[in-house]
Amino acid sequence: MVRLSDTPAPTESQKRLALAIIDFLNSSLKDGTLTADDAESIEIAQSCIADTFKVDPSDEAAVKDALGGQSLASIFSVYEKLRQKPSKEPASAGAQAQSTEAQQPKAGAPTPESDKLKSEGNAAMARKEYSKAIDLYTQALSIAPANPIYLSNRAAAYSASGQHEKAAEDAELATVVDPKYSKAWSRLGLARFDMADYKGAKEAYEKGIEAEGNGGSDAMKRGLETTKRKIEEANRGAEPPADDVDDAAGASRGAGGMPDLSSLASMLGGRGGGGGGMPDLSSIMSNPMFASMAQNLMSNPDMLNNLMNNPQLRQMAENFGRGGGMPDMSSLMSDPSLAEM
C-alpha cells in the first residue's frame, strides 16, 4: 500500500494542465456544451481537481499562464491536426475537406478591444518592451483565442526576447489555424532557425513562399537561402563565412582563414628567415609581445591591412631590406597601433 506521504507532489506542468482542465469544464458550462443539470457535478469535479493538484482556479494570472491565452479545446485540436496521418486508402476529396475542416482550430474573431490590445502590443514592440508586448498580445488572445495575427505577433515578441521555443509554438499554431497566413510561416522559420533546426526552418520558409505566391517576397527568399547555406555548412562541417568581410580583407587570408603573410614578407625584402641579414623568425616569435600580435592576426586577419600601413613598421622593413639591424623592441611596441594589437 502506498502511503500518501510517499506520493510525489504535482509538477508545475501537471498543475497547469489541471488548471486547463478546470477552465475547459467551466467553459463547457458557459457555452452550453453541458446543461445546467450538469452544473453541480461539474463544480464538484472542479473542486476535487483543484484540491488534489493544489491549484486555485480563481487565480486569473495562473490560469492565463497555464493556457497562454488559448483554450484547452483549441490546443487539443492542434494536436489532432498534427498527429493526423493519411489513411491506407485515399479518401475522396469531399471526405478529406470535411475531415480537415472538422479538425481545423477556429480563429477567434477580433474585437475592437482585442485589436486595441494588439496595437498597444505593436507599440511596445517598437519600444523594445518585449515582456509588455507579450502580455498585451496574450490579453488579445484571451478575447480572440487562436487568432493567427495575434499568435504571429506574440511569436515575434517571443523571438525578440530570446524565447524561441515559445515563438515556434505560437507561430506553428498560427499556421495550423490559417495556412495561408505567410507571416506566420516567416516567424516559424525564424524561430526554428534560432533553435538551430535548419531543416525545419527551410520547410517553414518554403511553405511561406508557397502561401505568398508569385515566387515569394524578397525577405522570405532571403530567409530560405540563408537556411539552405546553414544546412550546407552543417553537412560540410564548416564554419559559415562572415557576410561582412569585404574582398580586400578576404584577399589577406590564406588557406583555412589564416592571414596571408606574403605581403608582410615582400615588405621585408622578400627574404626568408635568417637570410640576407634578416633575423630568424623563430627568434622574433619567441618574443611574447610578437606572439600575442600573431595570435591576434590569426583571429582577425583584417588587422594585417592596418599593420601594412604602419609607418614605423614600414621603416623597420626598409632597414631590414638594406641589411640594417633589428629595431629597439621597447620603442617599437610604444607605437599605440601596435601596442593595442
Swiss-Prot record:
InterPro entries in the cross-refs: SGT, SGTA_dimer, STI1_HS-bd, TPR-like_helical_dom_sf, TPR_rpt
Annotated signal peptide: none
Annotated GO biological process: post-translational protein targeting to endoplasmic reticulum membrane; response to heat
GO cellular component, one term: TRC complex
TPR repeats: 114-147, 148-181, 182-215
Keyword vocabulary terms for this entry: Chaperone, Cytoplasm, Repeat, TPR repeat
Pfam families (alphabetical): SGTA_dimer, TPR_11, TPR_8
Region feature (Disordered): 86-123, 232-280
The family this protein is said to belong to: Belongs to the SGT family.
Subunit structure: Forms homodimers. Component of the get4/get5/sgt2 sorting complex. Dimers of sgt2 bind directly a single get5. Binds HSC family members ssa1, sse1, hsp104 and hsc82 via its TPR domain.
UniProt domain comment: The tetratrico-repeat (TPR) region has the ability to directly bind multiple HSC family members including ssa1, sse1, hsp104 and hsc82.
Family matches, as PANTHER family: LD24721P
This protein's name: Heat-shock protein cognate (HSC) co-chaperone sgt12
Gene from which the chain derives: sgt12
